[in-house]
């Protein structure tokens, strides 16, 4: 991964690098590989993530269709 440093502005380059790494999922990958994960734990985690994704998608779909509010007290328009 490469980030350009312009006008010796290292702070800006560091922020850009962190943003790129976050977008690519590198921080999450490093956290996952920090220790050994048993195959059974991996399956359970992946299943829980899939359930979470499915619920989130269903919630978004219901909000779009106007079945539930957007969580801010007023229904979506």
Swiss-Prot record:
GO terms, biological process: translation
Region span, Disordered: 38-77
Biased composition (Basic residues): 53-62
Transmembrane domains' residue ranges: none
Keyword set, alphabetical order: Ribonucleoprotein, Ribosomal protein
Alphabetized Pfam families for the sequence: Ribosomal_S21
Bias (Basic and acidic residues) ranges: 38-52
Gene3D superfamilies according to UniProt: Ribosomal protein S8
GO cellular component, one term: ribonucleoprotein complex
An annotated Gene Ontology molecular function: structural constituent of ribosome
NCBIfam families with a match to the protein in the record: S21p
Family: Belongs to the bacterial ribosomal protein bS21 family.
Protein name in UniProt: Small ribosomal subunit protein bS21
Species in which this protein is naturally found: Bartonella henselae (strain ATCC 49882 / DSM 28221 / CCUG 30454 / Houston 1) (Rochalimaea henselae)
Organism classification: Bacteria, Pseudomonadati, Pseudomonadota, Alphaproteobacteria, Hyphomicrobiales
